[in-house]
Amino acid sequence: MQVLHVCSEMFPLLKTGGLADVIGALPAVQIEDGVDARVLLPAFPDIRRGITDAQVVTRRDTFAGPITLLFGHYNGVGIYLIDAPHLYDRPGSPYHDTNLFAYTDNVIRFALLGWVGCEMACGLDPFWRPDVVHAHDWHAGLAPAYLAARGRPAKSVFTVHNLAYQGMFYAHHMDEIQLPWSFFNINGLEFNGQISFLKSGLYYADHITAVSPTYAREITEPQFAYGMEGLLQQRHREGRLSGVLNGVDEKIWSPETDLLLASRYTRDTLEEKAENKRQLQIAMGLKVDDKAPLFAVVSRLTSQKGLDLVLEALPGLLEQGGQLALLGAGDPVLQEGFLAAAAEHPGQVGVQIGYHEAFSHRIMGGADVILVPSRFEPCGLTQLYGLKYGTLPLVRRTGGLADTVSDSSLENLADGIASGFVFEDSNAWSLLRAIRRAFVLWSRPSLWRFVQRQAMSMDFSWHVAAKSYRELYYRLK
C-alpha cells in the first residue's frame, strides 16, 4: 500500500499549527506499520533547507509556471518537494506576508500543491505512484478534485484538521487552475459564489476524516460546520466520514527521555517532577512553593481557545492559592489582559508572550494542571502532552478534548478512569467550578498522584492512529 500525504507544513522543518505535528509524526509510524508513506510539500525555504539530500525527479511546465519535483528524505520518510521559487521562496509564513496579508496568489500556490498530488497518482514519478492520496486541510483540498477530473487514478482521503479555515477564492480563478468549470457547482467546489478549497476536499474525496471522533460528529452540526453541515451530514449517512484521533510523538514528548526538562521522570518516579516545578516557578518569576498548585496555559491567545474565560476566572483561581504560568501570543487585548494580571499579582502570575517550543516542554514538565478551555477543539495536542507528563488537563467537553480526558468525578475515580477535569459550558462560572474540583483533588495528595499515574498510563501513541488509517486505506482499495 503506497500513500502520499499532501500538505503544507511538517514539524520540525516548518510549523504554524498542529497540522505540522501530525505530518512530522504520522508517516514515519505508518512506515513502521507496513505502509509505504511519503509526503508532498511546497519547497518553502525552511523545508527546502531541511531536506539535504534532495534530487531532481522531473521538471514540468504547469498552469502555475515551471516547477521542479525533488525527492529526498527526512527522518527516514520520503519527501517530495515542489520547487517553484516564484511561488514558494518567500520569507516568514507560508500563507501571508509580514503585514499578515494573505498572498494574493495563494489560489495558484495551493492549487499547484493539489495538482501535483494528483499528477503523482498519474505517474509524475515513474518509479513510485500512490494507491491513496491523503490530503490535509484546505491547502491540499483541490487534490481530490484534480483526481476526479482525471478519472480517479487513486483513491483519496481528506483530513479536516480545522473546518474554520476554508480557502476561499474568487470564481474567476477557475480559468487559471486547470479544472473544468462544471466543477464550479453547488455539487462541487462552489460555496457562497466562490471557490472553496475546503469544500473541494469534502466533496470529491472518497472518504473524509476529522482529527477526533467527537469533532467528526460536531462538524455535522450547524454551530461547528460553517455552512458545510448539509454536505457533511450526507457524507456521514453514506459512511464516508469518520474520526481518527491524533497521537503524541513519543520521541519528542516523553518525560522519561525529554532532555529539555531539568529532571526526567516516569509514572513510578513522579516525585522527580517537583524539581521541574521549582525551576519553572523561578523562570516565570513565581513564588517557589510546592504547596501551591501551578496552573499553566500554552496556547494561541484567541477566543476559540477560550482564554478570555481564563482571564475572567483568574481572580477565583488566585484567591484559592493557585499560580498561573502562561506562554502564548495572539489577540492583543488578551495579551494585555494577562500582562496586566502578571503586574497586579507578582509571584502568582507569570506571563511570556510568544511561543518557544523548548519552553513549552518545561511548562508541561513543571506545571500541575494544563488549562485547555477551548470553545471548539478539533483534536488538541496540548491535553495529550499534559496526560503524558502527569500534568492534569482541565478542559471543556468538546472535540478531541471530550475524547481524551475523563473528569475526576467520584465515579470515575472509583472506576480508575479519571485523568483530569472537564467542564461543559463555555463560561467562566463553569470553568471556575472545574478549577474548584482541581483544588479539592490537590488537597488529597495520594488521590492526585493516583490520577496522575492513570493519566500517564493512557496510550495516545501514533501507532493507534496509524492502524486506523491503514484499515481505512484498505477499505477504500
From Swiss-Prot:
Q: Which annotated residues bind ADP-alpha-D-glucose?
A: K15
Q: Tell me which GO cellular component terms the UniProt record holds.
A: cytosol
A biological-process GO annotation: glycogen biosynthetic process
Q: Which UniProt keywords apply?
A: Glycogen biosynthesis, Glycosyltransferase, Transferase
Top EC group: transferase
Catalysed reaction equations from the record: [(1->4)-alpha-D-glucosyl](n) + ADP-alpha-D-glucose = [(1->4)-alpha-D-glucosyl](n+1) + ADP + H(+)
Cross-referenced Pfam families: Glyco_transf_5 (PF08323), Glycos_transf_1 (PF00534)
Question: Which InterPro entries does the record associate with it?
Answer: Glyco_trans_1, GS/SS, Starch_synth_cat_dom
Q: What is the name attached to this protein's record?
A: Glycogen synthase
Protein source organism: Escherichia fergusonii (strain ATCC 35469 / DSM 13698 / CCUG 18766 / IAM 14443 / JCM 21226 / LMG 7866 / NBRC 102419 / NCTC 12128 / CDC 0568-73)
Designated gene of the protein: glgA
